[in-house]
Regions:
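Nucleotide/pyrophosphate-binding catalytic subdomain
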Residues: 1-202
Length: 202
């Protein structure tokens, strides 16, 4: 069938809390504490790679992505830390989960397209979602990436009216899924929640 599915994912269970803890250490100017938490989180994800993927190709592809991600997190331990940096750190939870699921689905033979929510999810100056902007940008992006069975993107994260990384605050990924459903005139929106590990799909 020609049915297309658009999947919006949250961060993996416990990840957002860990990223907030890492941010707390950085606010308190404790890079050692932050690095300990970053290393622990990286080890957790590397263990998931071993169980999630069946081929060495996809294990290595995902490990390589994760190494880059966690090095990016470590880069925050060297600079001034503000709420802007915190939002960038917290956004990585969704970026990691969507990349891992996209790799998994590709390995399973699905024709998958991973879209970056930061390219189309935006709030206005009142910190409310900007539905016209979202519809216009997402329509353009979907037109550029036609012919996939499954589209995957991040829930919760967005850019604000000034183009800075931000988040939708309330409702998280469910809210993102609803906004995307409206923007694309989706036939239905299914919200799945299950706090166990990788099943946090909305």
């Amino acid at each position: 069938s020609n049915d297309q599915t658009f999947v919006v994912l949250s961060a993996m269970s416990g990840t957002t809390n860990s990223l907030v803890e890492i941010s707390d250490y950085l606010y308190k100017k404790n890079p050692e504490g932050a690095n300990e938490h970053i290393n622990a989180l990286e080890n957790t994800y590397m263990r998931h790679v071993e169980t999630l993927y069946s081929t060495e190709e996809y294990k290595e592809k995902t490990r390589s992505f994760l190494r880059e991600e966690f090095n990016y997190l470590r880069s925050f331990t060297k600079d001034l830390f503000t709420s802007f940096e915190e939002k960038s750190i917290v956004a990585q939870g969704e970026i990691i989960s969507t990349n891992m699921v996209a790799n998994y689905m590709q390995e399973q033979g699905f024709n998958v397209c991973l879209l970056n929510a930061l390219d189309f999810m935006r709030t206005d100056k009142n910190v409310e979602p900007d539905p016209h902007y979202i519809k216009e940008k997402l329509t353009d992006i979907m037109n550029e990436h036609q012919g996939h069975q499954v589209y995957i993107t991040q829930g919760f994260i967005c850019r604000n009216a000034y183009g800075e990384i931000d988040n939708l605050q309330r409702g998280g990924s469910d809210y993102t899924a609803s906004l995307i459903g409206v923007a694309l005139n989706a036939e239905e929106i299914q919200i799945w929640t299950d706090i166990d590990g990788m099943h946090n799909n909305d």
